[in-house]
Amino acid sequence: MATPHINAVEGAFAETVLFPGDPLRAKYIAETFLENVEQVTDVRNMLGFTGTYKGKRISVMGSGMGIPSCSIYAHELIKDYGVKNLIRVGTCGAISTDVKVRDVIIGMGACTDSRVNRLRFKDNDFAAIADYSLLSAVVDSAKAHGTKIRVGNVFSADLFYTPDPQMFDVMEKMGILGVEMEAAGLYGVAHELGAKALCVVTVSDHIRTGEKTTSDERQTTFSDMIIMTLDAALTL
């Protein structure tokens, strides 16, 4: 039952999919945290895997960078493979001084400079928000693990190299916790197709201070976030 961008067979994906941007990060998650892992798709090297976590069937697949790529894979996973829960796991940049490098942010809502949700919502503003049951499950898991989290709005940017750095001042004033590139599109697709979605990201760098995590720090913080998210997935 291949689609234009996924060559998995019918039933290859679990109902819950962890959705990092980097396909090699998907491979790392599958090989490190899942058991009985099988690679189920590799079109354009956008790797997808299915395995088990503490006995529960879980999938993980790369989404690529940006809303267009993420939206394509999310659409096909939901519509053609019956995926019910998509949880973006990745990294973001912080703006506010009260958000620190290595913090974990849960995107309750996603603002954006993209027009993609206006295109699907008849040129009106769509409130791109996370599914509450997913958000609640991850918050509960974070508390159980003692993981410090921040819950609030993220900003999904179309441009990585922005020509308007003054926009960061506006974001900070409006309480944006982190800048990434996919959540608003993911939330829009999920709402449109009747699925559930959530964005969970670690702060890898601070846009204001220039502070960045080392590769080792990034891996440790990311791993803590993945375990927290996988344990939440057990309750879905």
UniProtKB/Swiss-Prot annotation:
Highest taxon above the source species: Bacteria
GO molecular function: purine-nucleoside phosphorylase activity
Annotated transmembrane regions: none
EC assignment: 2.4.2.1
An example Gene Ontology biological process: purine nucleoside catabolic process
Binding residues annotated for phosphate, in chain numbering: G21, R25, R44, R88, V89, G90, T91
UniProt keywords, alphabetically: Glycosyltransferase, Transferase
Active site positions: D205 (proton donor)
Residues with site note (Important for catalytic activity): R218
Keyword set includes Glycosyltransferase: yes
One GO term describing the cellular component: cytosol
Gene3D superfamilies assigned to the protein according to its UniProt record, in alphabetical order: Nucleoside phosphorylase domain
Residue sites binding a purine D-ribonucleoside per the record: H5, E180, M181, E182, S204, D205
Statement: the UniProt record of this protein carries the keyword Transferase: yes
Catalytic reactions of this protein: a purine D-ribonucleoside + phosphate = a purine nucleobase + alpha-D-ribose 1-phosphate; a purine 2'-deoxy-D-ribonucleoside + phosphate = a purine nucleobase + 2-deoxy-alpha-D-ribose 1-phosphate
Enzyme class of the recorded protein, top EC level: transferase
Biological role stated in the UniProt entry: Catalyzes the reversible phosphorolytic breakdown of the N-glycosidic bond in the beta-(deoxy)ribonucleoside molecules, with the formation of the corresponding free purine bases and pentose-1-phosphate.
Family label: Belongs to the PNP/UDP phosphorylase family.
Record's subunit section: Homohexamer; trimer of homodimers.
Entry-linked HAMAP family: Pur_nucleosid_phosp
Protein name: Purine nucleoside phosphorylase DeoD-type
Source organism of this protein record: Shewanella frigidimarina (strain NCIMB 400)
Lineage summary: Bacteria, Pseudomonadati, Pseudomonadota, Gammaproteobacteria, Alteromonadales
